[in-house]
Swiss-Prot record:
The keyword Ribosomal protein does not apply. It is found in: Cytoplasm. This is Ribosomal RNA small subunit methyltransferase H. InterPro entries: RsmH (IPR002903), SAM-dep_MeTrfase_MraW_recog (IPR023397), SAM-dependent_MTases_sf (IPR029063). Specifically methylates the N4 position of cytidine in position 1402 (C1402) of 16S rRNA. It is an enzyme of class 2 (transferase). It comes from Oenococcus oeni (strain ATCC BAA-331 / PSU-1). PANTHER family: 12S RRNA N4-METHYLCYTIDINE METHYLTRANSFERASE, S-ADENOSYL-METHYLTRANSFERASE MRAW. Its EC number is 2.1.1.199. S-adenosyl-L-methionine binds at G35, G36, H37, D54, F83, D104, Q111. Belongs to the methyltransferase superfamily. RsmH family. Keywords: Cytoplasm, Methyltransferase, rRNA processing, S-adenosyl-L-methionine, Transferase. GO terms for molecular function: rRNA (cytosine-N4-)-methyltransferase activity.
Amino acid sequence: MTADYGHVTVFLRQAVENLAVKTNGIYVDATLGGGGHTDLLLKKALHGHVYSFDQDENAIDFNKKRFSKEISEGRLSLIHSNFQNLIKELNLLKVFAIDGIVFDLGVSSPQFDDEKRGFSYRSDARLDMRMDQSQSLDAYQIVNTWEYKDLASIINRYGEEKFASSIARKIIKRREVQPIITTEELVETIKEALPDKILHKKGHPAKKTFQAIRIAVNDELNVLQEALKQASQLLNSGGRISVITFQSLEDRIVKHFFNQLATKNQLPSKLPVPDKFIQEEFKLLTKHPLIPSVEEIEENHRAHSAKLRVLEKN
């Protein structure tokens, strides 16, 4: 069954416009989802080709129907794969360089809203959280088999949760009696580990822990670093990378990676080399990230934490 992909894409226009799309260019949508960015890329690259990746089979199935015309015309290729396989998958299709790529990170609304996927702390389902449902590691395994130190480590590192140790201890204690099978059972366990003052604060008390487990299940941060590296290697001169993030861990990785590339070839200021001879390979097009307008946040509450960063290859 395909999920309902009728959701609002954050930074839809800005993410694609910042790629400065050429009509005959080669572009990649690294996170197909509901096809919002792919649709806009197709409208702008009328004589080019778009390659769209998603590891979620539901997204591929949905978009095969949505873009059946563009696929049959040979303007769009849908690739059922994780974006850490960019170079491998594109090379198989005889594509060795691209003019731009857009990443829309995090869980897509349909994944989050589909209760059976086990992503949400607001509905009850079996613990899962796999973006690629063919992989074996899921949230149930992490919660019920990982050692205390590993649980505490990911909750602290990926969830930035200061009560990580207490939550990990409570998980271990509860699963010794019986397995923690559902999202609701995990939420109850997390709440039991937190002090009352935290439970009465704004925001869901399980949000940080669920984020941490989801990141661990999908190895999101390592995958992101690898994908950014590959994307930068694929770019033609003048090609751009446009990345939308929704949480600080991802944004830090993107910011650091972009800054690293943009300053890579800068020489120490004391060296007597004229500026005209110093040529950076990449340049930042967003010294500060773009953030959503009030209207976008009102239209889509998940947009409030979104940031857009753009890098260009010289």
